[in-house]
A protein has these predicted regions:
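Cysteine-dependent hydrolase recognition
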Residues: 1-175
Length: 175
């Protein structure tokens, strides 16, 4: 799952990473869009996971993919305890469980006015109240530092990942 701008800027490296995953015998999907809200991403992941012939096992979020800022779920965290009345950026939990745990139900609240990638969602009591992801997920999101090109960070990281996957690291070959 990648935003259009990040894909345009790091197409060669993203395609090389995709090929390295496929070389391990795994199928891949490439979901590219100008993501404005998290719901369409979650819906597509659920559809791909429900495919009986080739169910989705996991996903990687690359670049500027919306971040679900979960509210009303402090009981699911191990160490994060804060009054929900505090500033929402501080009292919400950024969590990709929004995308990978399909038994959790959420109600969309709003998009953050300052950080547009933040989308506040409330954990609904109608869904499960424990975490058991259906797929695995990871996120490749560059840090924002003045003078550093975030797309170069993505390119550099993916080059390292592909190089590591091509090395014969015996720890990756467990039997």
């Amino acid at each position: 799952v990648v935003d259009q701008k990040s894909y345009n800027e790091a197409k060669t490296e993203i395609d090389a990473y995709r090929a390295s995953v496929e070389n391990e015998g795994l199928g891949t999907y490439l979901l590219i869009d100008e993501w404005k809200h998290p719901e369409p991403i979650r819906e597509q992941l659920m559809q791909l996971h429900a495919d009986k012939k080739a169910p989705l096992e996991g996903c990687v979020f690359i670049g500027d993919v919306p971040i679900a800022m979960v509210r009303d779920a402090h009981h699911l965290t191990s160490a994060f305890k804060m009054s929900p009345k505090a500033d929402w950026k501080q009292s919400s939990v950024p969590s990709d469980r929004y995308y990978d745990d399909f038994d959790l139900k959420f109600n969309y609240i709003k998009q953050d006015s300052d950080i547009v990638d933040y989308h506040y969602v409330s954990l609904s009591p109608e869904g499960e109240q424990y975490i058991m992801p259906d797929i695995y997920s990871s996120r490749i999101r560059p840090i924002q530092v003045e003078g550093m090109d975030k797309y170069q960070q993505i390119r550099d990281y993916l080059k390292k990942v592909v190089a590591e996957k091509q090395s014969n690291n015996v720890l990756d070959q467990l039997t």
